[in-house]
Regions:
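Glycine-centered flexibility motif
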Residues: 1-3, 60, 70, 111
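Short beta-strand micro-motifs within the conserved protein kinase catalytic domain, predominantly
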Residues: 41-43
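N-terminal strand-loop-strand
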Residues: 1-7, 33-34, 38
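Charged phosphate-binding loop/patch that engages nucleotide di/tri-phosphates or the phosphate backbone
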Residues: 97-125
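Unchanged
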Residues: 12-36, 45-97, 120-125
Length: 125
């Protein structure tokens, strides 16, 4: 939203996995190449799902797309957690990422069905 600091994101395109969507959205909105890592949170209702991953910076220089954002900022964790213009959901996701020792990770799973290959995330055993 306007006057809010939000992380890049968007919809999963047909034929795309959430991880592929994350990489595409970061590139489109910021010019940054990232590599998705752990699943850190899911928010959903009957209409939409919001899936959040941690990610590693791979390459690129942060630039605004001048469409979905007016600027690209890097914030340190303490600043992101205390700024009023950072949404509560973003703050909760940062806190989840900081305490991910018991979080979900992608676990190999050999399963393909009618609508494509499954991705399975769970707590490591």
């Amino acid at each position: 939203g306007k006057n809010r600091l939000i992380v890049p994101g968007g919809y999963v395109e047909p034929g795309e996995t959430p991880q592929q969507a994350l990489k595409r959205e970061y590139m489109e909105e910021t010019g940054i190449v990232v590599e998705p890592k752990e699943l850190i949170g899911i928010r959903f209702n009957q209409k939409d799902w919001y899936v959040a991953f941690s990610a590693d910076y791979v390459s690129g220089h942060a630039v605004s797309d001048h469409n979905e954002n007016s600027e690209v900022l890097w914030l340190d964790i303490d600043e992101a957690l205390t700024r009023e213009d950072v949404p509560d959901l973003t703050k909760k996701l940062i806190q989840c990422a900081l305490h991910k020792e018991n979080g979900f990770v992608q676990i190999p799973y050999d399963g393909t069905r009618r609508y494509g290959e499954y991705s399975f995330y769970g707590i490591p055993l």
